[in-house]
Structure formats: structure tokens, C-alpha cells
């Protein structure tokens, strides 16, 4: 492409400081260095994790920054030494990379590649620099992806090449929310046929958990949320019954234990609230119940329960990106979507032009959207 090797000026949503709306700015995006890829984005989702960092609650939050981590686009140019991508490839950036070489990648028990973890947490690319500038200032990267920009640069291990026929305004969501919830049920909990599951929080991740539980053959899938408007939607994804904690005077874990003859086989916390994490564990059946933490809690918050809960056979687990080894799994998830094995379209409640990004955040905070997709 004629832009290869040159700085590209484009639109991006810059977070200048925590707690303030994003600002649409013209930014400069430098060409990719060795083992980096520059991408032209076509669509990006708006996720709670972006809002969490923007709020100032994230201990790793840095400003100014270009947020966003649910994107899809095409390769514009590649840096030196990049062999797996070429200009024009359809790609999804990955906030959990897969180098294939570190001890984490070589261990089948985890998907948490550590190759670039330190620099990613510092808002930089692996060579400890940023490719973004705005108004003469360096702007930080976010989660190694920064999809709230028309162009972004990512490490070549933080990218999946996917089916070029896939609609980018849908499959961008496989970069985070849907994959996270779906994999939590299939990979982390390994939900068994005939089981009873409880899902706390019926946003995009919770709905994806429900979808995973259904695919795994669970017979009872109980959705728990304070917003009854979400129940009808959850039913479409496979939930069989619902509980609104506001309708009960006793703690939610007691309600669930009574409903399920001693507790659920699997529970999932999709909110990021440490009190709910405890309730989700204590709603599990003695002897074999498993609770999976997916939600991200605020900086410095801690979980607690009585050790007896664990001594008597309950298991507490956590998961990131649904346990999927990203580079190899995301293309397969796209194929599952293309062959109608995986719902994605149903998660998209709003599609807005990129300039209306702050409206996307407002819809999410108001509980009016499952996922808003922004198109460039």
C-alpha cells in the first residue's frame, strides 16, 4: 500500500484523563517496527473493560490513552520479520497474545501468554515505545490493541488472521466478550451435560456464558440480574429461569441453594463485584460445585469466604479470555459463527458511527445495550 512506511494521520478516540468523555482527535500512527503489524480497523465493540479503565478504577490505567480491545480490520502494512500476515488479510487484534514459545503457551492448562505482558501493562509495544502521538504528545496503547482508532499497531503475536468473508462489524466481538463468556463455560468450567448452572450478571459476557452452558448440555441455566428487562433476552440465549435478588429478602446464595436442592453444579460471576463472587461460590453444591470468576473487580478489592466452603468440596476458579489460546482459537470461533454454531449477531443491539463513541458508553451504562458496535 502507498501508506506503508509512512506516518498515517487518522481519527481516534483519545482518553485524555480518567472520568471524562473520550475526545475524537486527529492522531499520528507511526509505521510498524519489527514484528509489528499496522491495521486499518473497520469496526470495534464497546466493552465494560474500556469503561473500567476510563473510570480510573484500573490500577494499570495510564493516560492519555487510546482504549478499545474488540476490533476487526485488515492489515495495512507489516514490520520487518513478520511472516504470518500480509497486507489485505482480515484480522482480529488479541489482548491475550499467543507467542507459542513461552512456558505458558507450551502448557495446555493456560492461555495466559506472558511474552509481552510487562510492556502491554505499561501501555507500550514490546520495544517499550508507542506508535501513537496526538498534539505533539505520546499517547499510550491499551491492552496491546487500541481499537478506538482508524489505524492501530499491534505485536504480530497479538493478532489472529480470520476468514475474509466474515462480517467485521460482527466478528469484532469475538475479540473479547463473547469468547470470554463462551469459553468460561466450555474450557474453564467444562460444564457437563445435565448440570445446573447459575450466571450472575446478564450483560454480553453473561449471555455468552449461558450460550456456552446450553451448548455443553446443561439442563437448568439460572440467570441472575437486578434488571428484569434482561430476562427475556437471556431466554433467547438458553436461560431456563431467572432470579432477581431484589425480589427476595434472604441472600441470593440461600435462594439458589433452596431452588436447586443443595446448590448449583457451576456458577459464573460476570460482574466484578466481590460480594457477588462470594455469593456465587456459596450458591454451589457441596462436594462438587465450581464457581468461575470472570468479572474484573476494582483496584485493591479482595474476595473472602469461610474456608469451610472450600474444605467441603467447592472449587473457586478464574478465567481470562475464556481460556482460549488466542491465535489458534479465534479463527475457529469465527468459523463456528460462519457455520451458525455460535451466535454473534444477537449480541449487537446498536451499531453507531465511530464519532458517536460516547453514546455507546452511555447506552452500556444505562443497561440499554448488550453490545454497541462502532463502524469507521
From Swiss-Prot:
Co-factor(s): Zn(2+)
Pfam family, one: ADH_zinc_N
Tissue expression: Expressed in the skeletal muscle, heart, gill filaments and liver, with highest levels in the kidney.
Keyword vocabulary terms for this entry: Cytoplasm, Metal-binding, NAD, Oxidoreductase, Zinc
Site positions for Important for FDH activity and activation by fatty acids: 117
Location in or out of the cell: Cytoplasm
Family indicated by similarity: Belongs to the zinc-containing alcohol dehydrogenase family. Class-III subfamily.
Catalytic activity: a primary alcohol + NAD(+) = an aldehyde + NADH + H(+); a secondary alcohol + NAD(+) = a ketone + NADH + H(+); S-(hydroxymethyl)glutathione + NADP(+) = S-formylglutathione + NADPH + H(+); S-(hydroxymethyl)glutathione + NAD(+) = S-formylglutathione + NADH + H(+)
InterPro entries membership: ADH-like_C, ADH-like_N, ADH_3, ADH_Zn_CS, GroES-like_sf, NAD(P)-bd_dom_sf
UniProt enzyme class: oxidoreductase
GO biological process: formaldehyde catabolic process
EC number: 1.1.1.1, 1.1.1.-, 1.1.1.284
Assembly with partners or alone: Homodimer.
Name this polypeptide is given: Alcohol dehydrogenase class-3
GO molecular-function term, one example from the UniProt record: alcohol dehydrogenase (NAD+) activity
Function of the protein: Class-III ADH is remarkably ineffective in oxidizing ethanol, but it readily catalyzes the oxidation of long-chain primary alcohols and the oxidation of S-(hydroxymethyl) glutathione. Also acts as a S-nitroso-glutathione reductase by catalyzing the NADH-dependent reduction of S-nitrosoglutathione, thereby regulating protein S-nitrosylation.
Cofactor: record remark: Binds 2 Zn(2+) ions per subunit.
Record keyword Oxidoreductase present: yes
Binding site for Zn(2+) 2: 99, 102, 105, 113
Amino acid at each position: 500500500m502507498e501508506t506503508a512506511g509512512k506516518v498515517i494521520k487518522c481519527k481516534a478516540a483519545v482518553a485524555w484523563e480518567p472520568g471524562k468523555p473520550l475526545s475524537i482527535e486527529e492522531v499520528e500512527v507511526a509505521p510498524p517496527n519489527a514484528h509489528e503489524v499496522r491495521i486499518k480497523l473497520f469496526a470495534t465493540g464497546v466493552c465494560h473493560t474500556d469503561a473500567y479503565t476510563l473510570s480510573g478504577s484500573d490500577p494499570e490505567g495510564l493516560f492519555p490513552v487510546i482504549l478499545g480491545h474488540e476490533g476487526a480490520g485488515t492489515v495495512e502494512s507489516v514490520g520487518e520479520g513478520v511472516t504470518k500476515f500480509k497486507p489485505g488479510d482480515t484480522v482480529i487484534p488479541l489482548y491475550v497474545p499467543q507467542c507459542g514459545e513461552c512456558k505458558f503457551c507450551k502448557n495446555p492448562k493456560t492461555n495466559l501468554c506472558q511474552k509481552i505482558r510487562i510492556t502491554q501493562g505499561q501501555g507500550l509495544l514490546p520495544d517499550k515505545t508507542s506508535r501513537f502521538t496526538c498534539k505533539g504528545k505520546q499517547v499510550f496503547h491499551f491492552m496491546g490493541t487500541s481499537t478506538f482508532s482508524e489505524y492501530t499497531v499491534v505485536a504480530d503475536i497479538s493478532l489472529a488472521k480470520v476468514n475474509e468473508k466474515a462480517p467485521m462489524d460482527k466478528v469484532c466481538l469475538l475479540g473479547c466478550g463473547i469468547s470470554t463468556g463462551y469459553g468460561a463455560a466450555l474450557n474453564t468450567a467444562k460444564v457437563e451435560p445435565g448440570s445446573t448452572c447459575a450466571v450472575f450478571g446478564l450483560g454480553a459476557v453473561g449471555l455468552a456464558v449461558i450460550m456456552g452452558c446450553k451448548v455443553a448440555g446443561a439442563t437448568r441455566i439460572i440467570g441472575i440480574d437486578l434488571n428484569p428487562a434482561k430476562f427475556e433476552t437471556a431466554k433467547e440465549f438458553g436461560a431456563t429461569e431467572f432470579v432477581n435478588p431484589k425480589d427476595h429478602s434472604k441472600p441470593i446464595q440461600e435462594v439458589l441453594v433452596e431452588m436447586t436442592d443443595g446448590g448449583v453444579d457451576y456458577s459464573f460471576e460476570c460482574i466484578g463485584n466481590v460480594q457477588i463472587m462470594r455469593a456465587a461460590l456459596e450458591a454451589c453444591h457441596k462436594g462438587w460445585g465450581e464457581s468461575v470468576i470472570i468479572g474484573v473487580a476494582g483496584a485493591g478489592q479482595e474476595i473472602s469466604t469461610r474456608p469451610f466452603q472450600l474444605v467441603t468440596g467447592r472449587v473457586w476458579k478464574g478465567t481470562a479470555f475464556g481460556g482460549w489460546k488466542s491465535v489458534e482459537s479465534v479463527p475457529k470461533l469465527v468459523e463456528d459463527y460462519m457455520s451458525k454454531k455460535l451466535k454473534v449477531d444477537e449480541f449487537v443491539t446498536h451499531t453507531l458511527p465511530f464519532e458517536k463513541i460516547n453514546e455507546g458508553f452511555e447506552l452500556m451504562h444505562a443497561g440499554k445495550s448488550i453490545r454497541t458496535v462502532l463502524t469507521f
